[in-house]
Amino acid sequence: MLLIGVAGTELTAQERDWLQHDAVAGVVLFKRNFASRQQVTDLSAAIRAAAPRPQLICVDQEGGRVQRFREGYSELPPLQDIGALYATDPQQALALAEQHAWLMASEVRASGLDLSFAPVVDLGRGNRAIGNRAFSEDPQVVAAFTAAYVRGMHAVGMAATLKHFPGHGTVLEDTHVDTAIDPRALDELRAQDLVPFQAGIAAGADAVMMAHVVYPQVAPEPAGYSPRWIQDILRGELGFRGVVFSDDIGMAASHSAGGVPARVHAHLDAGCDVVLVCHPELVDEALHAVQGRSLNTAALLGLLGRGALGWDGLLADARHGDTQSHLLETLGRTV
């Protein structure tokens, strides 16, 4: 199954044709797809109307620098701001994480989308791509925040996606533009980076997104192309039974598998349920690549959003304004 990107704020005829394809599980939206709150709500409805089956509509609405929808939405603080409070008041910090998750998820769901790919559970240890997207460098602290964030998302009827397995936070390289290699042994990864993923799985996380990072002491290929990581460790050792997403096959670190068809097949053969094809110019080639493959369509049904107030109902809900105010008072930024 593929999650695809579309070019703009309205669907083109070609994109409507893509949505008819059996392999298309849904759409990932980006800043380029956003003009206003009403427009993105209408776009979500148009995607659903154009497809013959339920579509999973997703976004990265983490907060901080990774927030695709801004005007008309709460300006969500980065997770690191919440993590910094843990040392002085762990209980308050965890409550804020749950509120942050609730606020993010309620606004995304009100716009007609199913999920935001969240939370980031990588360790905050200097990676250029992760930075303040991570709660903390401490695995146990991130584990506690992970469970709280999953609870907040689930309270709104949004599935939670742990990313980027088995941990992207310790390598310096940004896999959007570079190859990233983590030389550590599996035992060290188990004691560090895997701890938050274990906590998230125990809390009921619904999906996991793979990293395009190579861990050569564990497997020779990037984790998203690795049966060792997906089937033996994530599913076998950690007991994860949910949906496994690849990261975007347009990222530089994904190119090690070869061209677009090779990347798609490598992810699916390794055990990914869904491959992200976020660049529209790659979609035709990816769709051609999956012709004839057996597709696990049922796996995604559990990720569809459950219940939503819509914007009128959400803005009339006192909890929305109260949560905005509490985050502002505590973290000192406009939400």
UniProtKB/Swiss-Prot annotation:
E.C. designation(s): 3.2.1.52
Catalytic activity, reaction form: Hydrolysis of terminal non-reducing N-acetyl-D-hexosamine residues in N-acetyl-beta-D-hexosaminides
Pfam families noted in UniProt: Glyco_hydro_3 (PF00933)
SUPFAM superfamilies the record matches: (Trans)glycosidases
Main location: cytoplasm
Active site: H176 (proton donor/acceptor), D247 (nucleophile)
InterPro entries for this protein: Beta_hexosaminidase_bac (IPR022956), Glyco_hydro_3_AS (IPR019800), Glyco_hydro_3_N (IPR001764), Glyco_hydro_3_N_sf (IPR036962), Glycoside_hydrolase_SF (IPR017853), NagZ_Beta-hexosaminidase (IPR050226)
Subcellular location: Cytoplasm
Positions with a binding annotation for substrate: D60, R68, R133, K163, H164
Cellular compartments per GO CC: cytoplasm
Protein name: Beta-hexosaminidase
Keyword Phosphoprotein among record annotations: no
Chain's role: Plays a role in peptidoglycan recycling by cleaving the terminal beta-1,4-linked N-acetylglucosamine (GlcNAc) from peptide-linked peptidoglycan fragments, giving rise to free GlcNAc, anhydro-N-acetylmuramic acid and anhydro-N-acetylmuramic acid-linked peptides.
GO molecular function terms listed in the Swiss-Prot or TrEMBL record: beta-N-acetylhexosaminidase activity
Keywords: Cell cycle, Cell division, Cell shape, Cell wall biogenesis/degradation, Cytoplasm, Glycosidase, Hydrolase, Peptidoglycan synthesis
Pathway of action: Cell wall biogenesis; peptidoglycan recycling
Species assigned in the record: Stenotrophomonas maltophilia (strain R551-3)
Biological process, per Gene Ontology: carbohydrate metabolic process; cell division; cell wall organization; peptidoglycan biosynthetic process; peptidoglycan turnover; regulation of cell shape
Record site feature (Important for catalytic activity), residues: D174
Coiled coil: none
Homology family: Belongs to the glycosyl hydrolase 3 family. NagZ subfamily.
